Curated annotation (Swiss-Prot):
This is Asparagine--tRNA ligase. It is an enzyme of class 6 (ligase). The keyword Chaperone does not apply. It comes from Photobacterium profundum (strain SS9). GO terms for cellular component: cytoplasm. Its EC number is 6.1.1.22. GO terms for molecular function: asparagine-tRNA ligase activity; ATP binding; nucleic acid binding.
Amino acid sequence: MTYAPVTDVLSGKLAVDSEVTVRGWIRSRRDSKAGISFLAIYDGSCFDPIQAVVPNELNNYQEEVLKLTTGCSVEVTGKIVESPAKGQDFELAATEVKVVGLVEDPDTYPMAKTRHSIEYLREVAHLRPRTNIIGAVARVRNCLSQAIHRFYHEQGFFWMSAPLITASDCEGAGEMFRVSTLDMANVPMTDAGEVDYDKDFFGKETFLTVSGQLNAETYACALSKVYTFGPTFRAENSNTSRHLAEFWMVEPEVAFADLDDAAKLAEDMLKYVFKAVLEERRDDLEFFAQRINKEAITRLEQFVTSDFAQVDYTDAIQILQDSGRKFEFDVEWGIDMSSEHERYLAEEHFKAPVVVKNYPKDIKAFYMRMNDDGKTVAAMDVLAPGIGEIIGGSQREERLEHLDKRIAEMGIDASHIEWYRDLRRYGTVPHSGFGLGFERLVTYVTGMQNIRDVIPFPRAPRSANF
């Protein structure tokens, strides 16, 4: 017996009159007066369910088929036939229906056949992938993830696994989750009245990582081109639609590369993954265009054919000041541009993706390369129409004396990153990279309004269920 994914049947990959078995779950059941039941069966392999036409001649028709409700799992065997109805080209003429699992109480099943609010679905995150919308998000998320790995592999990059537990604060923001095995009811203290981390598991204070960048730099300075792709954590008490406490980051790092090289890599990567999702998940994107954001497809198509605009931060500030627009947040040199500023540049002024370069040093991290003017660093943000910042990156400071000066200016304990300073002592090279928040990318592609709906189990302030 041939087991076939629903997508293979609906796409015509299997020949008409082939006998196959489809395994999945009931989306709906409709009974006709002619003694035939129509089962809509999905298995997650594509957006659309397949229709199985079940005659009442089957032995278990009365006892089992007529008791099938939304969510029941089945194995249906039958012949692939051309569908006379609109909506799909093929359906299954069932010769056997095997009930694998029933829904205990259809009346209380949380995913009963009705339209649920996206807020409600967050409360039942363990069941929400069964819905059309979250199932589509999951497939798009997978497609983007695979495309990212494929892109870097084709470009000659090596994937490296950055540690999740670290003693370093890459961004210097201090918003980190502490990792400890100390007994919170009996915390050991030093004579100075401080927590004695020497008694802790690692013998020092440790945290969940906010970025794999510093670790990636060590491997880029040996393998030339590397990238990390994994979870990162921020203990930022922001209960908004744009923030998560746990999220995934894509962080490439390239030796012998300057800021322009990083900007070109970012453009090439985004266009590659957007082309991939347009080709591979068209069915899901059509759903998002119909239900979530009517521009879900057109803006991706425009993105991949657009030339990226380039602008210095100083010039971008001048553009905003000369716009005549009244912004909620005032515009002046030295600010960290807000989303409204970023979107104005991308959507109204340039009408294209924009790379903003050379930011004031005071709003950027210690590791970014100081420019000759002494006021700005070789940093960049990629701004996308419809969302604003989607990528942030920089050329790293490869000169030890400049790095040490920045470390001192920002009050960072250099002893914690002595290993990072070693990279500048032993065969230092210019190198650059960037970070892409993966969930931000998924929200952009799908048009979903809340970042908590594009990751399977969102972690946020006072929310760590499942």
